[in-house]
Design a protein with these regions (language model features):
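Short amphipathic alpha-helical "interface-anchor" segments enriched in bulky aromatics
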Residues: 68, 259, 316-350, 355, ...
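An anionic, glycine-rich sequence signature occurring as long contiguous blocks
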Residues: 235-338, 424-428
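Domain-level cores of phosphate- or acyl-group-handling catalytic modules
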Residues: 188-245
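Basic, amphipathic alpha-helical segments enriched in Lys/Arg and hydrophobic/aromatic residues
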Residues: 343-374, 378-406
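Short acidic (Asp/Glu) and glycine-rich catalytic loops that position anionic groups and cofactors
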Residues: 1, 31-34, 72, 298-303, ...
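Dynamic "connector" segments at or just before major functional cores
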Residues: 1-163, 170-186, 193-207, 396-428
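Short, glycine-/Ser/Thr-/acidic-enriched flexible segments
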Residues: 147-149, 176, 183-185, 243, ...
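Short, conserved catalytic/metal-binding motifs centered on acidic residues
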Residues: 53-54, 68, 86-90, 140-148, ...
């Protein structure tokens, strides 16, 4: 057996987190406190410190808020100037930032709760502008979808996926979440979606962030939603619902063009359709021959998919390929569930958990900003690396704070000299 010596020096295995804490403070602290307001004037923690403490949980490999007190406090508190708060303080802050649910009644008389969390949604956009991830006056591509979060909280409702939970509507630009509005899990995806999207668009436009192209699934294919989306973007691309009138038009079509997309052979065509009275749009039709050879009662030997759009210039192939990129956004939800705590919601009610969803969305957006600034190849990382890889290859490095010549210095115990460029701040 190897000889063991015990050293009582204050070393931490999370040496990489300190530079991230400093960058969070430099980039976002002022934006957070000016948007949410000062939480205290003398003693206590500001909201920027609370969000930074929550960020450290997930960027150090934690899975729930309590990890900051149970496992990380003794390491994070080694920083000479930046304070870390307890899990109880984070949970109290979530309650303080909670806004009341809005209850809507459907035509059938059923009631559904929504939570808009306006202030936190505004902060989400302002933080992206402060990071430089969004720029005022520019146009972006926009995606919207509903994510079903499985949970057995007090007010969780049964979803169509056969589990209890919530179904928040999530708006995404590029790889960044720009808006979240939570809803009861049993709410139909189209119910009040127009109002949700309109609020998200108006928040973006208030910050002079504009939408060039919007992509959505068939849950957004209704007249009132399409009218509203068209008013806030140049072009929209929405998966169209199939109906008997569409089949009559599709079966009579000629001039199908055979193309290969991602190694799969499809046939493409497009027509003008009047899906709603007096409103003609372009319908891009994609069909694929059934592999099993069986005939469908409606579609025959093909499987049909349609995209409704007001883009009359792009080719059918370009439109299909652009719409297919929407599938990559599912990675964001997977990332939030497994890396940023969406699968372990901390509170018992939807209104409070909505604040948590937005807090962690802000943290993930900040993580993406860090990956853009970091010379990832020097740490064996890529810009698309997941949080677990980031923890192993960047955060997990032995370190020790010392004070010499009236200055605080962080000693990093690593043969990777790239860390030297990250710790050049004088803490006096």
């Amino acid at each position: 057996m190897a000889k063991i010596q015990i050293k009582s020096e204050k070393l931490t295995p999370f040496g990489g987190i300190f530079s991230i804490m400093e960058q969070f403070d430099a980039l976002l602290a002022q934006t957070i406190d000016s948007t949410l307001g000062l939480r205290c004037t003398m003693f206590g923690y500001q909201y920027s410190e609370i969000l930074r403490s929550l960020m450290c949980v997930y960027l150090c490999g934690g899975s729930c808020i309590e990890d900051v007190t149970t496992h990380l406090m003794k390491h994070l508190s080694l920083h000479p100037t930046l304070r870390t708060c307890s899990a109880d303080t984070i949970l109290r802050a979530i309650e303080e930032l909670t806004c009341k649910n809005i209850t809507y009644k459907s035509a059938s008389g059923n009631s559904y709760d929504f939570n808009t969390a306006d202030k936190m949604n505004c902060l989400l956009i302002k933080a992206l502008l402060a990071n430089g991830q969004l720029k005022s006056g520019q146009e972006y591509d926009f995606d919207f979808d509903h994510q079903f979060i499985e949970t057995e909280k007090h007010d969780a409702k049964p979803t169509y996926k056969k589990f209890l939970g919530y179904s928040p509507g999530v708006a995404v630009i590029n790889d960044m979440i720009v808006g979240i509005e939570n809803r009861d899990g049993n709410t139909n995806v189209r119910f009040n979606q127009r109002e949700t999207l309109e609020r998200i668009f108006k928040r973006l436009e208030a910050s002079e962030v504009y939408i060039s192209r919007a992509r959505m699934d068939c849950g957004s294919c209704s007249e009132e939603i399409v009218d509203m989306v068209e008013a806030h973007c140049r072009h929209f691309y929405i998966r169209a619902n199939r109906c008997s009138s569409f089949y009559d038009s599709m079966f009579a079509l000629t001039g199908w063009k055979t193309v290969e997309i991602n190694g799969i052979e499809f046939e493409l065509n497009s027509i003008l359709v009047e899906k709603w009275k007096g409103k003609p749009y372009r319908l891009v039709i994609q069909r694929q021959r059934r592999i099993d050879g069986d005939l469908d009662i409606w579609e025959g030997e093909y499987t049909y998919r349609c995209i409704l759009t007001n883009d009359y210039k792009s080719s059918a192939r370009d439109i299909v390929e652009f719409y297919n990129l929407r599938g990559g956004k599912e990675r964001i939800f997977d990332d939030m569930n497994n890396g940023f705590g969406w699968n372990r919601l901390p509170k018992s009610f939807m209104a409070q958990n909505t604040v948590f969803l937005l807090m962690t969305a802000l943290i993930r957006n900040f993580y993406k900003a860090i990956m853009q600034r970091l010379k990832t190849h020097e740490f064996g990382l890529r810009a698309t690396s997941r949080i677990k890889t980031f923890v192993f290859k960047f955060i997990s490095v032995p370190a020790k704070w010392i004070k010499t010549s009236r200055r605080h210095v962080l000693n990093i115990y690593s043969d990777n000299y790239a860390y030297a460029n990250l710790f050049k701040t004088d803490f006096g």
